[in-house]
Regions:
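Extracytoplasmic/secreted proteins, especially bacterial periplasmic and envelope-associated proteins
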Residues: 22, 35, 89-93
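Non-catalytic, surface beta->alpha helical segment in thiol-disulfide oxidoreductase systems
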Residues: 63-103
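Thiol-based oxidoreductase modules, predominantly thioredoxin-like and allied folds used
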Residues: 15, 31-54
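Short amphipathic alpha-helix with an adjacent loop that forms part of the alpha/beta core around
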Residues: 56-61
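Loop/turn elements at helix/coil->beta-strand transitions in domains of secreted/extracellular proteins
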Residues: 7-11, 42-47, 73-76
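Local sequence-structure signature of Cys/Sec-based thiol-disulfide redox active-site neighborhoods
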Residues: 1-32
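Solvent-exposed loop/turn segments at secondary-structure junctions
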Residues: 18-21, 29-30, 51-55, 75-77, ...
Length: 103
């Protein structure tokens, strides 16, 4: 969060699991696209946590992955979503998160 504060960016937190088929598909179909990551990194610090390998704070421990959280630089949730998203659906979610962050 310190980096996000320093860079004046919000945070995109993707929580997945190593053996999650839909998490792998999201990475392959959406996050692997350079134009998706370009837009994401313009406004967000990007973090990935695997429930299998990383500590996941309690406020993000919800059933099911992939989980998508958009946080302000202080860690407050401004938007959240669940599931596999194609690039167009992910962009819609980014638009919604951007709108919520301006409230």
């Amino acid at each position: 969060m310190k980096l996000a504060q320093k860079e004046h960016k919000n945070i995109y937190l993707f929580i997945g699991a190593d053996k999650c088929h839909f998490c792998k598909m999201f990475k392959e179909k959406t996050l692997s696209k350079k134009w998706v990551m370009k837009r994401l990194k313009e406004h967000y610090e990007v973090l990935y946590l695997s429930r299998d390998r990383h500590y996941v704070p309690k406020k993000f421990e919800k059933f099911g992955v992939p989980r998508h959280y958009f946080l302000d630089a202080n860690g407050k949730i401004i938007f959240q979503s669940f599931g596999l998203l194609e690039p167009s659906g992910f962009f819609t979610m980014l638009d919604e998160a951007d709108l919520n962050s301006n409230d």
